[in-house]
From Swiss-Prot:
Gene behind the chain: murA
Species in which this protein is naturally found: Pseudomonas putida
The name this protein goes by in its record: UDP-N-acetylglucosamine 1-carboxyvinyltransferase
Positions where 2-(S-cysteinyl)pyruvic acid O-phosphothioketal occurs in the chain: 117
Homology family: Belongs to the EPSP synthase family. MurA subfamily.
Lineage: Bacteria, Pseudomonadati, Pseudomonadota, Gammaproteobacteria, Pseudomonadales
UniProt superkingdom: Bacteria
Amino acid sequence: MDKLIITGGACLDGEIRISGAKNAALPILAATLLADGPVTVGNLPHLHDITTMIELFGRMGIEPVIDEKLAVEIDPRTIKTLVAPYELVKTMRASILVLGPMVARFGEAEVALPGGCAIGSRPVDLHIRGLEAMGAKIEVQGGYIKAKAPEGGLRGAHFFFDTVSVTGTENIMMAAALAKGRSVLQNAAREPEVVDLANFINAMGGKVQGAGTDTIVIDGVERLHSANYRVMPDRIETGTYLVAAAVTGGRVKVKDTDPTILEAVLEKLKEAGADINTGEDWIELDMHGKRPKAVNLRTAPYPAFPTDMQAQFISLNAIAEGTGAVIETIFENRFMHVYEMHRMGAQIQVEGNTAIVTGVKALKVPGNGHLRASASLVLSALVAEGDTLIDRIYHIDRGYECIEEKLQMLGAKIRRVPG
């Protein structure tokens, strides 16, 4: 497995382009199964989970075609099997997203219970209950969810999510797109990635309204047609590079992004002392060589502060002036990176779902020079004195396209070495 070697101390300065959002691309790829003709999806990030989803289609008999711009064409009419096997699903929880589209379009599906990232418990109950509300018969046996649509297909339903679930909202919304009648999803997830999926369904001729609010209304249609669609930019990648510049006292301009989907993060960066300017598809951050100020934050579902940016802000607070409290309300076990930061001299006290971080002037390379991988630790290594070796970077590669190349473009001293 590859490793990253980072020499801290460089002040980042430059411009980079933001990749497509993995968390929008995966449900959009799943939704191509709803169409009755070929669909082309562009701006896909080159990440392991995207490759796994495309491989899953291959196992089902669909042969994805990739063009010179790395857009992928999927023709669901060539599907030969309605089974998503365990050996692929276990590596990626998002595989569950093919369940709703397959039941809606083909009348049945068999999807292995997912594995993937080990953050807390993420039950698939909401997906199952939502499909049952639409008339599907579902059994869970032998590690597989086996679903069958009723005679005449899925029926529109009113469904209330008792906890906000992004993938649950997406799965039921996709199924409802081809169901008979109207579906109303209440307490739905409001994330921009849900909106992007709704826009994609509508681009194929669907009738989805209210995405981005907590009530989504879907009027089922008889068929969804071919479309050409470009995936939205990745807001977490955007935020991570902005924080990278902030912790080093530097300047960065991120292009091909969308400032409107990152307002909670930009607000906290301003609190930390950053000067921020935005355009339609770019954000510029400048710290003017200053050390950031510590910030308090609480994660919550969109449009509040995203849980996927929490660790990066702990890295920021760790070298900031003052003390900041970070409260995690979404996932359990989301402070696993803190132990590694302690080894770098960070002053962090964890009490339940809260991390109290008191900034120090400088972080140091840990005793043996090694850290377990996470994007937040890459940020910490950028400001540590000396060379830090980050191993097990599989998890970074799952979420970030070409992280070392983009950081090099900003002046970071970072290189990838074979494991």
